Amino acid sequence: MTNEAGNTALSIATTGYEFYYLRLYDKTHGTLADEQFGECGENIRMHTDSLSPDVHSYKVVLFGRDGVVYSHGKFIKEGNNWIYLLSVVSDNLGSSLMTFVLPLIVLDLTGSGIHLSIISSFETLPFLLLGLPFGAIVDRCDVRKVLTRSDAIRFGGYALLAAVLSARSNATVTLIAIYLVTLVIGCTNVFSSVSEITFISYFVSKSDYSKMNSIVYGIQYTAGLLIPLAGGALYSVVPMGLLTLICAACFLLSAGAILLMRVGSSKGAGGLRGPVPAAVRTVIGDTRQGLSYLKTRRVVLYPLVLAALFNVLTGNFQNDSLVIMRKSLSFTSGQVGLVMSVTAMGALAGTFIVNLLNRSFKFETVLIANFLVQMCFRLLFVAFGNIFAVAATLFVVDLCQSVLNIIIITNRQNLVETRYLGRVTSIYKAVLIGVNSLGFIYGGTLSNTFGPRNAVLWSGVEILILTMIGIGAYAHLNKERTTDE
């Protein structure tokens, strides 16, 4: 689509068709760049030398004499999408490697698991405590700058930690440095994770959100599958400081990729200016607006409520399944590792089928069906004792969970206006991460009282009840839509 001058050009064969309708979109400025309708010749040639190179999205519809319609659109080309995916790859390489390496460093330094728990809380608590105001801030900021500065902070934090580790400071100094860096980066990750979902809307059309989200999740799951294997080999031969510096370099590369993108992501609502008290009042007001917006948009609220309840009911399943495999089925650590590798591949497989599901069915249909399939295979997991059957059931469970994550994100991007997307995303993250803690407590109590098998069986019954509630809620919502129309 790009000519020698770097501007957008397009040629499409139209043999067998009589009329054509063609649109070119400028995603940088959110405008329709060009539009044509006419009779087909041998091909359509768009003369767009005056257009910006940022014009990279198009849709063409061809009409035949017999009424047959052909529709085609462009998703990924050389340019912003590929550069963004480079940023995602480097970001996930750094995050996955640090997620694997940091616990090993802490255990080697202290020999105590309590420090791991504290560090884990530093990674999740910022979402609970700061998610809502940070989401409001993101909605008033240039999201590209938020992403690049977040990557810069992570680079600086891990580079500092690498220096401390390389200097072979005493354990106390090193542990304090790990605490401080983890806390700062935990807060930074709130900004980054909220911004990246909003940022996609600036250069990807709504019809392609699902594709981009599935690719991003595919990269994440692939990194989560491969990096521990590489990290395990590297940790024994590469110094801690150098490994940490490699992680830091990944975030520097991610920031550089974002800077190379030709995307305008201007501030919403004028940014945050003026005295600190006024800015705080603005953030509080914006947060309230986000909550009010979510309450009035039930089509956005229902998925949050259903997903939150689902997380409470299934939050402890991974722990229960591990106990069942080790204690009830007497699997060796090698067998458990094999099963976990298969389940990770299930999560990756989910990223490949989610686009087909999104194209073929409504969101609520996929959501409800997902609950039902997960219920069935969680119950089947309890029924089997063979390692291959256990691996197969958990493969499907993780596949469904992957699909669930992507469809919820895509649905939110499709339904929420860009000016509210940061706030709504932060509400989703704060709620869903918060209820995970409740899920661990609730599921752990059931497991401790009745045993892990019975806890999983009971969660299956609860998921069935939740599914019925979801069917009723969406039936009522669809009835109201029909009445309004």
Sequence positions of predicted segments:
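Juxtamembrane intracellular "pre-TM" segments in multi-pass secondary transporters
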Residues: 76-81, 264-304
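Substrate-agnostic recognition of the 12-TM MFS/MFS-like secondary transporter fold
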Residues: 83-100, 120-138, 142-156, 177-235, ...
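Short amphipathic helix-loop junctions that connect adjacent transmembrane helices
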Residues: 101-114, 319-334
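Transmembrane alpha-helix termini and helix-breaking/packing motifs in multi-pass membrane transporters
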Residues: 103-109, 162-169, 226-246, 327-328, ...
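MFS-fold secondary transporters
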Residues: 107, 160-169, 185, 257-258, ...
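C-terminal transmembrane bundle of multi-pass solute transporters/carriers
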Residues: 129, 140, 146, 150, ...
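Helix-loop junctions at membrane interfaces in 12-TM secondary transporters
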Residues: 163-181, 382-394
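Helix-loop junctions on the cytosolic side of multi-pass membrane transporters
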Residues: 198, 202, 244, 248-276, ...
